[in-house]
């Protein structure tokens, strides 16, 4: 078979851009044209005319040749007919039968099913239609646009001929697209179409994406897609879940089989400083390897298993292991979300699972004399393990009490009222209905009344009533569906606000636990490699040794346990969960804390010895005790098919505020207590080198010989069982997993298949173009260090994002349509739509005012503009024929990308720093600037803002404010109003008194509405287009002058010093994208991780980004404060009012004043841009790290000048790492590269 040509790196010219835009416009305009585009691919069919007959291609693992084919199984091409026995009902038709063949969508003839009548199918008629709709998951546009974006990229870069040929064969089977996915679900299904095809087309996109990024080869991609096809023959998602664990059972053996591996050494900062040959001999549980081999052979499809075994024989290094794992991940899952009817998922999602022991109920030791159900203290039976855990928990009480912020408690409930669902719907109060005149606003309020913050504002008068709380405690809790990638669908309890109010008290008491305990991990807070520092460190320990124990040779050293706590929410028994609430009652003793109807009181208490006495109880303690008395809450679902389906009592409601905190605390106490009792019972200690816990994720680093570690882990499993939990063991000396982050012998093995570019959990959520671009960039940020070839990833993003997001549809009154179309068509491709008039006369006034669809194609370059899509720009041709430098995937965002406008404008013949109007027009950059300046792609938000009644919002905000024991918001509003009278208007979201208002506005802004009610071109925008669209020019902005610089690497006399990182990583990749001499490798090894900046320089560096030291402030509000201080003086009345409006007091105010003074003095040394820690990950984020790349004679002595130079040079190096050579760079002002 033919092979692909060598890699090509196309540069952007006006001609090529026009060709991409016109092709995209054509295929996005008509489905027929898109279908024709996809199947008319002569290059692909000529190179691979037959992909069904086995042929040889290279694998990504050491270029090993493998036999591949793509044969669509007969059951997919000729699917069975649907019958109701596929989803049988129980005997009284109140739910699905417990013992049924499928929980997810199975394979059957889709077209034939849709032809069946409701009379024939009965209840299944609607249920199965809804089940099929779960397969519609497209994140942007539709399936076919996404596939077109993939194919357009592959054609542009002359790649993927075999995959393209396979797609042609799939699509020509129907002679058209087999179905269409829209906002309203699937339509136009063709005969002989299996219900598996939507997910299989996502699978095709998934393997194609992995191939594009070189995570796998094209041959691997075909193998993986064939595996997906075979899995889909009966029930695709059920089968994937069954086989999921089989794909990586070989990992531990292959690590062991290496015997030795070149391994990086990390210092205390997490930086590589050397390497060594590590003994990879594994910690082995009896017969573990043999059992895993048998499981793999039985679980995996024979065709995939055969190739897996072939590739395993090629493994020689840790990098090879990670390569093969990546292939297995691509074959295992397809980046789709596991979605089904909640009625089919309930048994796995929320139904209580009985495992191990029944946890004993705590014995009350004190209670209210008048109501013994209100228990104030209790102890677990002394023989139970929970009794020992409870005593261990008590050791934390004093520290927890010290950390509680008593002054913040009154406002804490309001802060928890998010814009998420409140779990229960309400009727709008009559008073509110009477206040609303606009039907559109009434619609928004009705939709938004189910959101926490708005619902509480509407029902605030009932805040102090006990009856609503009692009602909500006995109410059947609504289940909110959560779909996940690679994990079965979950059910989150939609907790009502009143239950949240009670539960929040326990949370406040225990919130500091994560701060004061050793084990709780704060997870992915930084987003960079510091999150996996512990795994990097403990998988690279050298202290493994062989010892003799009773004549047997054993290993001693670090063992990493990545044990899985199975279904923690469904396994936690009520009696076990009560421990935290009982502790909270004691922790909160002695403070002033009122909660709703529960107020400070003097209560008569009776204890277990029969003593009766009086005691002060605060509202928080009473609220918890009330909650405990009603803790046996039933979780269930309100089924649209079966009515109310109650769940058995005992499930831990995963929607509680305390859920993550409770699980973290419970597991920490369990393991710490077990380590203590282990020593007491057996007279030997187990060395826990490190322990990380967050929610139900546990990573345990143990030190000892194999026998002792195994003995302790068996003991730990038993202790988990005594609490009704199942701990599935997974120990290794070579690898560990925590929070889905996997490290193997010091290498980060990121799970690329967990990042979904093409699918979304909720495909119906509509976002603006700007929001979609931000989301797409965030997805790319997540996948960079999980991907082998990030240059190809970036090339793909530029084309794919343009194809799926460039079609923008809005509405305009009919009488404006022709004028607007004519004006826009002078520079843009315009999508035209016919008008469907009310009557025959198109001149009728009613028809003239009708809203009519019109669309534009957003220019290709918009997606690479600052303020637009902000994809790092590619290499563009200038007027003189030269090309700009391409910006790398690590490039900063924000104002930094405006440098590209000057890069493309300045030439050797015309080096003057300027924006060239001609080149702006040539690449439509002036149009992009117009779209951004006039917010033309965010029409919905502006129209929604005109609907929302601010007076009503203020009333609702005041309702919530009445719950606080403070007048700070009122003082803030008065100060803001005084400033307004003086002509100073502060941003509403920065004024403390209006922050509740802004949260309520956000609820209404985010409610989904139909296109018929939003996205209409208003008069102001219409006028702007008609008057300024043609003549708009890109203007130079304040601060742009600082873009006039370059780095000159031509002085070969000033050489870069070869450092320890370069030597250590000469043959090692610590992540997939960090192969030696790759962009990430160059940045990691050449930037200085340990630059020691002085205090003065640190302050200057923070200022250059717009910060002051480590002080955090709202940037918009700070800008306003600088204006006020500059005009009126720092000690002026307006400044006092500003601080009152912002609720900035005491030490924070002093810091703010200090920041203002510094800013005013050094305002010319600002160069802000944004970098995302996830995008850089291993790469140093410290701007000063660039110092090692700069000619030292060129660096100024002044701290602010030095900081500004470092900041500019750092952005340049991140954007153009390929320019780094053996020489240090000279910083050159007043010259564009």
From Swiss-Prot:
Subunit structure: Interacts with VP6.
UniProt KW Membrane keyword: no
Record family assignment: Belongs to the reoviridae RNA-directed RNA polymerase family.
Pfam family, one: CPV_RdRP_pol_dom
Catalytic activity: RNA(n) + a ribonucleoside 5'-triphosphate = RNA(n+1) + diphosphate
Record EC number: 2.7.7.48
Protein name per UniProt: RNA-directed RNA polymerase VP2
Keyword Nucleotide-binding carried by entry: yes
Keywords: Hydrolase, Nucleotide-binding, Nucleotidyltransferase, RNA-directed RNA polymerase, Transferase, Viral RNA replication
Domain RdRp catalytic: 1-775
One GO MF term attached to the UniProt entry: nucleotide binding
InterPro entries in alphabetical order: RdRP_C, RdRP_N
Role: RNA-directed RNA polymerase that is involved in transcription and genome replication. Following infection, it catalyzes the synthesis of fully conservative plus strands. After core assembly, which consists in recruitment of one capped plus-strand for each genomic segments and polymerase complexes, the polymerase switches mode and catalyzes the synthesis of complementary minus-strands.
């Amino acid at each position: 078979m033919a092979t692909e040509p060598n890699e090509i790196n196309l540069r952007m010219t006006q001609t090529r851009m026009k060709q991409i835009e016109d092709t995209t416009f054509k295929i996005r305009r008509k489905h027929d044209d898109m279908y024709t585009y996809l199947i008319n691919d002569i290059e692909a069919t000529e190179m691979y005319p037959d992909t069904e007959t086995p042929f040889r291609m290279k694998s990504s693992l050491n270029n090993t040749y493998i036999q591949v084919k793509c044969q669509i199984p007969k059951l997919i091409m000729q699917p069975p007919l649907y019958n109701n026995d596929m989803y049988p009902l129980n005997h009284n038709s109140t739910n699905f039968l417990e013992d049924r063949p499928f929980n997810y969508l199975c394979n059957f003839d889709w077209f034939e099913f849709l032809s069946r009548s409701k009379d024939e199918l009965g209840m299944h008629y609607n249920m199965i239609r809804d089940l099929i709709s779960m397969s519609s998951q497209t994140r942007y546009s539709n399936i076919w646009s996404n596939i077109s974006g993939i194919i357009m990229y592959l054609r542009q870069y002359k790649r993927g001929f075999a995959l393209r040929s396979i797609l042609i064969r799939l699509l020509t089977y129907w002679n058209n697209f087999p179905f269409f996915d829209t906002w309203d679900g699937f339509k136009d299904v063709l005969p002989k179409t299996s219900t598996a095809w939507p997910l299989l087309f996502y699978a095709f996109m998934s393997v194609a994406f992995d191939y594009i990024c070189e995570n796998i080869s094209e041959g691997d991609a075909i193998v993986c897609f064939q595996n997906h096809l075979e899995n889909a023959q009966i029930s695709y998602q059920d089968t994937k879940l069954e086989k999921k664990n089989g794909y990586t059972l070989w990992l531990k053996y292959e690590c062991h089989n290496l015997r030795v591996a070149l391994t990086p050494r990390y210092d205390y900062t997490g930086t590589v400083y050397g390497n060594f040959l590590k003994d990879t001999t594994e910690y082995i549980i009896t017969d573990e390897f043999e059992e895993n081999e048998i499981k793999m052979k039985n679980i995996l499809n024979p065709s995939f298993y055969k190739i897996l075994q072939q590739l395993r024989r090629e493994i020689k290094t840790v990098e090879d292991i990670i390569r093969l794992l990546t292939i297995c991940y691509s074959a295992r899952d397809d980046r789709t979300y596991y979605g089904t009817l909640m009625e089919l998922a309930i048994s796995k999602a929320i139904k209580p699972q009985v495992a191990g022991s029944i946890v004993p109920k705590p014995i009350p030791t004190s209670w209210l004399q008048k109501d013994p159900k209100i228990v104030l203290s209790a102890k677990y039976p002394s023989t139970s393990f929970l009794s020992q855990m409870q005593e261990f928990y008590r050791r934390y009480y004093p520290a927890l009490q010290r950390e509680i912020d008593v002054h913040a408690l009154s406002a804490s409930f309001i802060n928890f009222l998010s814009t998420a669902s409140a779990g229960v719907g309400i009727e709008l109060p009559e008073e509110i209905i009477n206040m609303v005149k606009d039907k559109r606003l009434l619609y928004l309020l009705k939709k938004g009344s189910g959101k926490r913050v708005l619902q509480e504002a509407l029902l605030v008068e009932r805040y102090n009533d006990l009856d609503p709380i009692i009602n909500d405690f006995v109410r059947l809790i609504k289940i909110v569906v959560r779909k996940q990638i690679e994990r079965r669908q979950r059910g989150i309890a939609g907790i009502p606000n009143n239950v949240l109010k009670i539960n929040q008290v326990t949370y406040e008491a225990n919130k500091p636990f994560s701060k004061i305990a050793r084990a709780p991990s704060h997870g992915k807070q930084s987003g960079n490699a510091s999150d996996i520092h512990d795994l990097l460190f403990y998988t690279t320990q050298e202290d493994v040794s062989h010892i003799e124990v009773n004549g047997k040779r054993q290993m001693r050293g670090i063992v990493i346990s990545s044990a899985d706590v199975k279904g923690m929410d469904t396994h936690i028994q009520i009696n076990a969960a009560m421990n935290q609430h009982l502790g909270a009652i004691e922790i909160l003793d002695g403070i002033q804390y009122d909660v709703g109807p529960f107020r400070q009181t003097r209560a008569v208490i009776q204890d277990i010895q029969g003593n009766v006495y009086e005691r002060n109880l605060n509202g928080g303690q009473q609220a918890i005790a009330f909650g405990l008395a009603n803790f046996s809450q039933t979780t269930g679902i309100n089924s649209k098919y079966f009515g109310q389906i109650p769940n058995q009592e005992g499930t831990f409601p995963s929607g509680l505020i305390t859920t993550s905190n409770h699980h973290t605390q419970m597991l920490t106490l369990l393991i710490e207590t077990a380590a203590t009792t282990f020593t007491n019972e057996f007279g030997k200690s187990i060395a826990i080198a490190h322990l990380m816990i967050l929610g139900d994720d546990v990573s345990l680093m143990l030190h000892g010989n194999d026998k002792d570690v195994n003995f302790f882990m068996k003991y730990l499993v038993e202790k988990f069982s005594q609490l009704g939990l199942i701990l599935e063991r997974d120990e290794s000396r070579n690898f560990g997993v925590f929070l889905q982050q996997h490290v193997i012998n010091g290498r980060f093995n990121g799970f690329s298949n967990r990042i979904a570019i093409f699918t979304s959990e909720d495909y119906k959520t509509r976002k603006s173009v700007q929001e979609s671009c931000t989301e797409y960039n965030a997805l790319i940020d997540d996948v960079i260090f999980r991907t082998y070839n990030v240059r190809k990833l970036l090339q793909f993003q530029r084309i794919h994002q343009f194809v799926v997001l460039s079609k923008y549809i809005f509405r305009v009154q009919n009488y404006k349509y022709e004028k607007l179309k004519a004006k826009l068509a002078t520079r843009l491709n315009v999508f035209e739509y016919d008008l469907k008039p009310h009557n025959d006369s198109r001149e009728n006034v009613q028809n003239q005012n009708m809203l009519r669809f019109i669309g534009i194609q957003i220019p290709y370059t918009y997606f690479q503009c600052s303020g637009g899509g902000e994809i790092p720009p590619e290499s563009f041709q200038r007027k003189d024929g030269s090309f700009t430098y391409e910006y790398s995937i690590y490039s900063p965002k924000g104002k930094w990308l405006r440098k590209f406008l000057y890069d493309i404008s300045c030439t050797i013949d015309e080096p003057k720093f300027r924006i060239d109007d001609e080149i702006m027009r040539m690449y439509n950059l002036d149009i992009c600037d117009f779209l951004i300046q006039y917010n033309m792609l965010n029409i919905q938000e502006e129209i929604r803002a005109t609907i929302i009644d601010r007076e009503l919002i203020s009333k609702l905000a005041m309702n919530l404010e009445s719950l606080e024991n403070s007048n700070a918001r009122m003082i803030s509003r008065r100060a803001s109003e005084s400033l307004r009278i003086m002509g100073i208007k502060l941003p509403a979201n920065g004024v403390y008194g209006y922050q509740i208002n802004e949260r309520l506005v956000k609820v209404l802004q985010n409610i989904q509405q139909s296109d018929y009610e939003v996205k209409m071109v208003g008069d102001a925008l219409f006028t702007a287009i008609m008057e300024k669209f043609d003549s708009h020019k890109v203007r130079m902005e304040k601060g742009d002058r600082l873009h006039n610089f370059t780095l000159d690497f031509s002085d070969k006399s000033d050489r870069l010093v070869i450092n320890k990182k370069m030597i250590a990583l000469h043959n090692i990749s610590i992540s997939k994208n960090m192969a030696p001499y790759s962009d990430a490798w160059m940045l990691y090894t050449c930037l200085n991780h340990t630059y020691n900046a002085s205090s003065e320089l640190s302050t200057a560096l923070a200022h250059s980004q717009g910060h002051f030291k480590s002080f955090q402030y709202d940037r918009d509000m700070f800008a306003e404060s600088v204006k006020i201080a500059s005009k009126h003086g720092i000690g002026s009345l307006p400044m006092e009012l500003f601080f009152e409006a912002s609720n900035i007091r005491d030490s924070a105010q002093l810091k703010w004043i200090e920041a203002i003074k510094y800013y005013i003095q050094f305002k010319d040394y600002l160069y802000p841009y944004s970098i995302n820690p996830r995008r850089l990950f291993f790469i140093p984020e410290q701007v000063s790290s660039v110092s090692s790349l700069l000619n030292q004679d060129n660096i100024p002595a002044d701290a602010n000048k030095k900081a500004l130079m470092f900041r500019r040079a750092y952005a340049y190096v991140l954007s153009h790492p390929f320019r780094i050579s053996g020489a240090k760079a000279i910083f050159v002002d007043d010259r564009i590269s």
